[in-house]
Curated annotation (Swiss-Prot):
The record marks Y766 as: Mediates interaction with PLCG1 and SHB. It is found in: Cell membrane; Nucleus; Cytoplasm, Cytosol; Cytoplasmic vesicle. This is Fibroblast growth factor receptor 1. Present in an inactive conformation in the absence of bound ligand. Ligand binding leads to dimerization and activation by sequential autophosphorylation on tyrosine residues. Residues 25-119, 158-246, 255-357 form the Ig-like C2-type domain.
Amino acid sequence: MWGWRGLLFWAVLVTATLCTARPAPTLPEQAQPWGVPVEVESLLVHPGDLLQLRCRLRDDVQSINWLRDGVQLAESNRTRITGEEVEVRDSIPADSGLYACVTNSPSGSDTTYFSVNVSDALPSSEDDDDDDDSSSEEKETDNTKPNRRPVAPYWTSPEKMEKKLHAVPAAKTVKFKCPSSGTPSPTLRWLKNGKEFKPDHRIGGYKVRYATWSIIMDSVVPSDKGNYTCIVENEYGSINHTYQLDVVERSPHRPILQAGLPANKTVALGSNVEFMCKVYSDPQPHIQWLKHIEVNGSKIGPDNLPYDQILKTAGVNTTDKEMEVLHLRNVSFEDAGEYTCLAGNSIGLSHHSAWLTVLEALEERPAVMTSPLYLEIIIYCTGAFLISCMVGSVIIYKMKSGTKKSDFHSQMAVHKLAKSIPLRRQVTVSADSSASMNSGVLLVRPSRLSSSGTPMLAGVSEYELPEDPRWELPRDRLVLGKPLGEGCFGQVVLAEAIGLDKDKPNRVTKVAVKMLKSDATEKDLSDLISEMEMMKMIGKHKNIINLLGACTQDGPLYVIVEYASKGNLREYLQARRPPGLEYCYNPSHNPEEQLSSKDLVSCAYQVARGMEYLASKKCIHRDLAARNVLVTEDNVMKIADFGLARDIHHIDYYKKTTNGRLPVKWMAPEALFDRIYTHQSDVWSFGVLLWEIFTLGGSPNPGVPVEELFKLLKEGHRMDKPSNCTNELYMMMRDCWNAVPSQRPTFKQLVEDLDRIVALTSNQEYLDLSMPLDQDSPSFPDTRSSTCSSGEDSVFSHEPFPEEPCLPRHPTQLANGGLNRR
């Protein structure tokens, strides 16, 4: 009996030993789960939940193996394996994968598959087709399960958030996403530039889709630029992510091709040729390369269009950089001919052509001067010549600049004024002031420019000015108010002047007062005096900013001028764009009245009248633009900053010999390239101002680099007709932009033409701005503002004028009102 039991004991022991020593079974190739499984059980588990997997077993199972993604599953502090069951505590997204339970028995092996996804994210990351109703609903997550543990917020798809800078064209839709999760379900809020972002902070608002952790902004505009931060938080933590948005303005032009490209080529037979075509365009251009060919001996077809062969066209994955270059390999005589780069967009087409000439290959001849000795001699001679030229140029420049230097104490305060006012220290004045007034040099009376209550200007010594009874206003009759702005050396404040009109000594008038800043220099003081004296000399006119008075005695210099309550013309027009098409930076602002065509023509007419008067006084403005035209409470146009112009009483042009900061988008070619300023160059600027008026404050040639603008002007490029401008007015602009200055109209002729057009234009002829101005006209305002006389627009030459003063503009104070003919 005991022998039988002993034998049975040893049999069981041997069997158990063999089973234990058997190596872990591997899946047969045909049963590998990484092929196409027959049956897979899918499980979605939330982070922090308990993951339980149970394998179905047969009665005769001898061994069980667990694998995840083809790798043996091992136990850990969170993972427990008990035969046919696997438990994973506090599951995390890294626990996701394809689990396999492999069982072995005498009858064969069997595999059970489990597809596990540990995530709170939705099955699809896209929400393009989500209902808009989801924008007001919080993301619903089952956080009430008893086995859920608290989890701080975390990103569920960080790889989709790697792109932080998003540059998009205006009018596009922008969507930012911050897919995340946590327990309990976290909240989502958005900041713009570090401050709370609310729907009423932008025109059109925005949508937040909590189900997909996203924010959507339709029809973005330049004011939407900034940093957008999503903050995801619950009681156990907080995370944030910042996106940067840059909105690019659209250029209302057909493609612009760089001058001189493609260039003509002359090559030898068998050479390689490369044609280059540089294209500037927004919207996206379509580029093609064509070769002109002959058909039956003719280059022109029956439709009067040239025969051509398409050599290269843009594909789905072809970039603009690739399309801008045409490569020809191993050219033959048949390759000679005319090649054209054709670029088009939704606005129009542009093309440039070049010729390829193929010559016989030249026989190589031994070079005569290729030895190192000859090359060394050439290099030394060339270097010596260049150095000599540089030294000579410096010497000549020094000699010329030395002869042109003038002492500050004797410089004139205005340009060739009838009476000059030199600034002097400690001057002696004759007892008979009238004698000195008639002597041709007006001496300065002892009167400090700094009062006892105001510190002396940092860069200005103690100077004295004469009192002019015609313009002098006692300081106690001037009440200074709030600042209106400041510029390069001065500032402007709103003030109330009492008794400007001698006949009404108690009448209070709102005025603007120009004064120096505390860090002004002697040069700045001279410029302010120069402007004041120029305004005295020019006199008064309804359509210019007039001098009203000055405070020159016993304190700082105050220059009192007319106050224009509605700001400059550019901002005035932008504020009155029709609803839905303007891009106003004040979301609460809505225009109350739409401008008519007659209003716009009246603007141009009044500016032309003001310029006609300045021209009659032999003054050249040099910086005529909508930003330098101010609008009064009664909608009267007044030209500003003409006091900075040069007097040309004895010569009919003004040539600037030193480089400076120039408003190149408004400048005539002769002023831009030769620094020659005339009344005709002001007429060119008036043409650009007309274009600004009929685009309601648009920015000329936006986004065009300075060097490209130079080339475009030399090639005869002119801006296109605004959408709501008549052909007659556009032809007036083109006449103002004539390349030959003498062929441009005079301001007198412009006044006569505009007077006639105003009379013929109906008051009810309102602008139809329902056309797509966001693509075809500059209805996007230039966000940059000007504080200097030359302005701060997108195309400028960036060296400051050494002798051009720079006073601030009046800030815009928007008010509605139609324009009447003045």
